[in-house]
Amino acid sequence: MYHLWIKCLAAWIFLKRFNGVHVMHAKAPMYPNEPFLVFWNAPTTQCRLRYKVDLDLKTFHIVANANDTLSGSAVTIFYPTHLGIYPHIDDRGHFFHGIIPQNESLTKHLDKSKSDINRIIPLKTFHGLGVIDWENWRPQWDRNWGNKNVYRNRSIQFARDLHPELSENKIRRLAKAEYEKAAKSFMRDTLLLAEEMRPDGYWGYYLYPDCQNYDYKTKGDQYTGKCPDIEMSRNDQLLWLWRESTALFPNVYLEIILRSSDNALKFVHHRLKESMRIASMAREDYALPVFVYARPFYAYTFEPLTQEDLVTTVGETAAMGAAGIVFWGSMQYASTVDSCQKVKKYMNGPLGRYIINVTTAAKICSHALCRKNGRCVRKHSDSNAFLHLFPESFRIMVHANATEKKVIVKGKLELENLIYLRENFMCQCYQGWQGLYCEEYSIKDIRKI
């Protein structure tokens, strides 16, 4: 009886300490002792090769492809025309491959996809991010609103042509069922093929999950940022997709209307919160790694994020427990020498220094709190605790000469710093480790790895 009471007390302390939140194990980081990674996924090759402008990505510990290409060993993104025969209508109204998934051969698509993967990712030991960017239609019928409604209309006409004898209600039901079945097969089987061919990669679809919390334009001060219940329910229905994914790739692109506003943080926070929820429900043994797509400039502009919005995007992403952030950019970044210099100036200023701040702080917390065997995650997801270097204890120093540039972080973690981390963060242990501070081997988890 005494031992039972002790066990109950320990369980109560555990739940109270961690706010009653069950934290699943995490997959070990892509690179050892790097709990939070920053990737560069912008086509800035011309800056280096044509304009001789080095963006100094390595200086600030940013993971990038060779020569800063859009696709390579670190991250490869597949657009609609790059992988298989993806049926869709493009932004200019051009039709491709039967338009709707039920009107195209899945077998032909997978055969072409196999060839494309071998061509674009020749390395069979590919260990980077494999991102499939299919945004033209969504696999759920009810989510094809607005300009995507054309896929519903085409599906209805397709069913009507095949079954003219059916009533209109039956045709609509049939169209929905056939569309969702074919869309699911296209997305699921493409993912399975990619994972079979390049099993060490981190595979998933860009903008999945989404939570459709874009109503900041109409709500103003009434905006909460919360994902609508119906959208969270629809995400639950995509369990088949989450189970086959090996990573999630949501986005937190900020429009300029959100610049340095409370709404920006609400927008980002709830998108991340939903992504972490999905990551924890996909599998029984570990939470999927979440790599969050962001832009270093406001969407549809060439204006850099403010310091406040760097915290809102990069800082919030790290504090919520994501595995990393991926900076996406357009051809505009490398369109002229002036564009390249603008990106470089921002990189050598607020952007680069903040990246060093957060990635180093995440590593320090992992070392100090989680014995290097886990990553630090907010105890209370809605708190304003961030993984930042303590300014009274650490300094970021940049040393440059004619041939190279180095960033050095000097300082040490003081007792009061450690107390702050323990009060505000908890450990999400990597597979193979357990305990409050990931200090114990977990034989059960090791066998699953």
Swiss-Prot record:
Gene3D superfamilies in UniProt: Aldolase class I (3.20.20.70)
Localization terms from the record: Secreted
Signal peptide: 1-23
Key word Disulfide bond present: yes
GO biological process annotation, one example: carbohydrate metabolic process
UniProt keyword annotations, A-Z: Disulfide bond, EGF-like domain, Glycoprotein, Glycosidase, Hydrolase, Secreted, Signal
SUPFAM superfamilies from the UniProt entry: (Trans)glycosidases
Main location class: secreted
GO terms under cellular component: cytoplasmic vesicle; extracellular region
Positions annotated as active site in the UniProt record: 135 (proton donor)
Glycosylation sites: 67, 103, 153, 357, 401
Domain EGF-like intervals: 427-438
Listed Pfam families: Glyco_hydro_56
EC annotation from Swiss-Prot or TrEMBL: 3.2.1.35
Annotated disulfide bonds: 47-340, 211-227, 365-376, 370-427, 429-438
InterPro entries for the chain: Aldolase_TIM, Glycoside_hydrolase_SF, Hyaluronidase
Top-rank taxon: Eukaryota
Gene Ontology MF, one: hyalurononglucosaminidase activity
Tissue-specificity statement: Expressed by the venom gland.
Reactions catalysed: Random hydrolysis of (1->4)-linkages between N-acetyl-beta-D-glucosamine and D-glucuronate residues in hyaluronate
Quaternary data: Monomer.
PANTHER family on file: HYALURONIDASE
Described function: Snake venom endo-hyaluronidase that degrades hyaluronan to smaller oligosaccharide fragments. In venom, it is not toxic by itself, but increases the diffusion of other venom proteins by degrading the extracellular matrix. In addition, it displays antiedematogenic activity.
Family in the record: Belongs to the glycosyl hydrolase 56 family.
Protein name (database record): Hyaluronidase
Lineage of the organism: Eukaryota, Metazoa, Chordata, Craniata, Vertebrata
